[in-house]
């Protein structure tokens, strides 16, 4: 929830740990194109997995980088055997993507310029919001990537939620994301 970007060495350790236990790693990489201070790295990057995709799944979507939230269009990459199992299950669930969404997906995948434009839009919002929060006495932690700022004033998150709500600003309390978020709020760009 905080936008922290895991580096190559950290991800290598995750892969090594999982392989030692024959565990699947499913990496949500929907924000991969939205790094700000750090460039996110895929679990499938050769520096992370040495080119071996066994038990690794990278999950991608167009919802963030292409502004196609709720279209439910995305894909898996990685271990071919795991993907074959997922395709088999999906085939029997009767799920079908409507034709217009298929066409929108194809258009998005064939055009990289809109992603750069969308990223710039988010970057501009992030800069304005970051500066406004800091001016209001907040500290921004992590927030190296993604569409959120992880902000704190050093108080209980619910006090911050109330303070911001009084000013017409809606945020998510950090406690929604676990005890480590008790003094943070998640602010959407």
Regions from the language model: what does each represent?
Residues 1-189:
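PLP-dependent class I/II
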């Amino acid at each position: 929830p905080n936008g922290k970007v895991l580096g190559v060495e950290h991800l290598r350790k995750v892969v090594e740990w999982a392989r030692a236990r024959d565990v699947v790693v499913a990496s949500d990489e929907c924000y991969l194109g939205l790094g700000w201070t750090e460039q996110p790295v895929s679990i499938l990057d050769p520096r992370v997995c040495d080119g071996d995709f066994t038990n690794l799944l990278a999950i991608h979507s167009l919802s963030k980088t292409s502004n196609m939230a709720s279209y439910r269009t995305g894909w898996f990459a990685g271990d071919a055997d795991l993907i074959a199992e997922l395709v088999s299950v999906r085939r029997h669930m009767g799920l079908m993507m409507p034709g217009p969404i298929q066409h929108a997906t194809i258009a998005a995948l064939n055009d990289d310029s809109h992603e750069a434009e969308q990223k710039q839009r988010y970057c501009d919002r992030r800069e304005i919001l970051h500066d406004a929060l800091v001016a209001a006495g907040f500290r921004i932690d992590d927030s190296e990537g993604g569409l959120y700022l992880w902000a704190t004033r050093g108080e209980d998150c619910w006090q911050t939620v109330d303070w911001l709500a009084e000013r017409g600003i809606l945020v998510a309390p950090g406690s929604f994301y676990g005890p480590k978020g008790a003094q943070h709020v998640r602010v959407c760009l």
